[in-house]
Amino acid sequence: MILSYFGDGGFRLQSGDLSLLVDPPNNRLKADVVLKTLVSTEMTAPEVGEIAFPGEYEVRGIEISGIGVTEESTDKYLKTIYLVRWDEMSFAFLGHVKDVPSIDILEGLNEPNILFLPVGGGHFMSPQDAAKVAKKIEPNLIVPAFYKTPTDFLKAMGQKGREEEKLVFKKKDIITDTGKVLILKTNN
């Protein structure tokens, strides 16, 4: 599997000829499945291959659970957290979350192999809150998103982190890690 980062909350996972894209920063990026963690409540129907709402989905062997973040959603915007199961691994995308999710939501994420976490503060989780969430969820790898620099998050985690252009991996490559931070360089 290949993991790439496109800035902000934009990530692509690819396994063979199948790809999943989360919060694409532009319309040029294409994938078989697109997840949106923040959408306008005026959106009536997502495009083909796009998932933008809470619910249970299965697309070409990828199992997706969308969990609505009602505490942060408004009459204009809906926020969704996704848990993705694919190739015997699980991936949790917290997207545009600002506050620490409820215990029920955190327990529902069930120790994902990779946690994608907003860490930049402001409209997103503070680095300190993000570190608390990461330590509670206990993923193998943590990939920060929505930040200017990862310094404050790395400090809160007590790590230096490892930086990569992209991550090429199989489950056996990451299951021995516990709570390791991976900083991905932006691919534009």
Question: What is each residue range found by the language model?
Answer:
Residues M1-V33, S40-E42, E47-I114, G122-Q128, ...:
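Core dinuclear metal-dependent hydrolase active-site scaffold
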Residues L38, I137, M157-K160:
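Alpha-helix boundary/capping residues
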Residues P46-G49, T151-R162:
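Short, aromatic/basic amphipathic alpha-helical patches
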Residues E111-A145:
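A contiguous pocket-lining binding segment that forms or flanks enzyme active sites
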